[in-house]
C-alpha cells in the first residue's frame, strides 16, 4: 500500500512538472514580444541620488524637435567597430519604438547628429544644451516649435552593458529630453544596465513627430504714415513654423480694394523680414491699411496672416 501511494505521488509530481514546462514553453512561443518589451525593471539601489532634477519627463524647450522625421547621422572614423555597432543599435531601438523616426547615415558636413568617440572629437558650441556627453548643439528657439538643427554624441565613457545604454541615453538627450529623477529611466543622470527607454518618452516623441511640418507666418508689427494721398509703411513678418514659407506675397488692401502686392520670396523657419514701401498711392479718404500674407506652403494657422494698421497723419 505504501509502495502504491509512493508511485501515485511520483506520477502526480511528474505531471505537475510536465505541465509547468509546457506552460512555460507556451508563453515563450506565443508571447515573446510582451516578455521582451514589457520586462519589469527593478530600481537600482546603488545609483547615487540626484538633486534639482524633475520627476517629470520634459524637453529643454516645450515642443522641441527636429523639423523632419528622417534624421541623419555621421559616426567619426575614430570610433571602433563595437562603438559603431552599439550606436547603430541605439538608433534602431528608438526607430522601432517610435515607428515614426528614422535614422540614416550621411556625410559629416550634412549630418544632423555627429557621433565621436573621444573628448576631443567635436567641440561644443557656446550657449548650448549638453546634458552629460550628448545633446542639441544648435537650436532655433521659435515660439511654436523650437527646432533642433544639430546634435552631438560623445561615446568615450561607455558603460559595459549588453544593451546600448550609454548610446540611448545620449541619443534621447539629442532629441531634446532633460534628465529625470527616476533610477529606472534611461534618462536618469547615472546609468545602470537595467534601465529602459520609458514609454512616456516614446509617446512624447510619437506625438511630436506625428505633427506634419508646416510654416507659420505672422506679423510681428506694422506701421503706416500718411501724407496727402501717399503712404509710407513698414511691416515685420516672421515665420515661427517648422519649414520655410515659399513664395510669400504681401497684399495691401484698403476698403476691400487691393492697392498693391509685393513678393517677399522665401522666409526661412525661425527667420523674418522687414519690408518697407514709400509713396504708395492711396485714396484720400482711406484712414487705415490691411496687410495680408499669402504663401503656397501649408501653415499651422492662417488667422494671424492679416493685420490692420491705422495711419499716423503727418
Task: Explain the meaning of each model-derived region.
Residues 67-71, 99, 109-113, 149-151, ...:
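Envelope-exposed proteins and targeting segments
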Residues 81-174, 260-263:
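Metzincin-family zinc-dependent endopeptidase catalytic domain
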Amino acid at each position: 500500500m505504501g509502495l502504491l501511494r509512493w508511485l501515485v505521488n511520483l506520477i502526480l509530481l511528474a505531471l505537475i512538472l510536465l505541465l509547468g514546462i509546457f506552460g512555460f514553453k507556451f508563453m515563450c512561443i506565443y508571447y515573446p514580444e510582451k516578455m521582451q518589451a514589457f520586462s519589469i525593471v527593478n530600481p537600482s539601489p546603488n545609483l547615487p541620488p540626484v538633486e534639482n532634477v524633475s520627476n517629470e519627463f520634459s524637453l529643454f524647450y516645450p515642443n522641441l524637435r527636429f523639423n523632419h522625421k528622417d534624421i541623419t547621422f555621421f559616426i567619426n572614423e575614430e570610433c571602433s567597430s563595437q562603438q559603431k555597432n552599439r550606436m547603430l543599435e541605439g538608433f534602431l531601438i528608438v526607430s522601432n519604438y517610435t515607428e515614426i523616426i528614422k535614422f540614416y547615415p550621411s556625410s559629416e558636413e550634412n549630418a544632423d547628429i555627429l557621433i565621436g568617440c573621444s573628448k576631443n572629437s567635436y567641440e561644443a558650441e557656446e550657449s548650448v544644451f549638453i546634458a552629460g556627453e550628448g545633446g542639441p548643439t544648435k537650436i532655433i528657439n521659435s515660439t511654436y516649435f523650437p527646432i533642433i538643427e544639430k546634435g552631438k554624441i560623445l561615446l568615450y565613457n561607455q558603460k559595459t552593458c549588453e544593451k546600448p545604454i550609454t548610446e540611448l541615453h545620449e541619443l534621447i538627450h539629442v532629441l531634446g529630453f532633460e534628465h529625470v529623477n527616476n533610477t529606472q529611466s534611461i534618462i536618469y543622470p547615472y546609468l545602470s544596465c537595467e534601465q529602459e527607454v520609458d514609454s512616456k518618452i516614446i509617446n512624447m516623441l510619437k506625438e511630436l513627430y506625428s505633427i506634419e511640418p508646416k510654416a507659420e507666418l505672422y506679423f510681428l508689427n506694422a506701421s503706416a504714415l500718411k501724407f496727402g494721398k501717399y503712404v509710407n509703411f513698414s511691416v515685420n513678418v516672421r515665420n515661427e513654423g517648422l519649414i520655410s514659407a515659399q513664395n510669400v506675397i504681401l497684399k495691401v488692401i484698403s476698403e476691400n480694394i487691393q492697392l498693391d502686392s509685393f513678393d517677399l520670396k522665401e522666409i526661412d523657419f525661425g527667420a523674418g523680414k522687414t519690408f518697407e514701401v514709400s509713396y504708395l498711392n492711396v485714396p484720400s479718404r482711406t484712414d487705415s491699411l490691411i496687410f495680408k500674407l499669402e504663401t503656397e506652403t501649408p501653415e499651422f494657422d492662417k488667422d494671424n496672416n492679416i493685420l490692420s494698421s491705422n495711419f499716423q497723419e503727418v
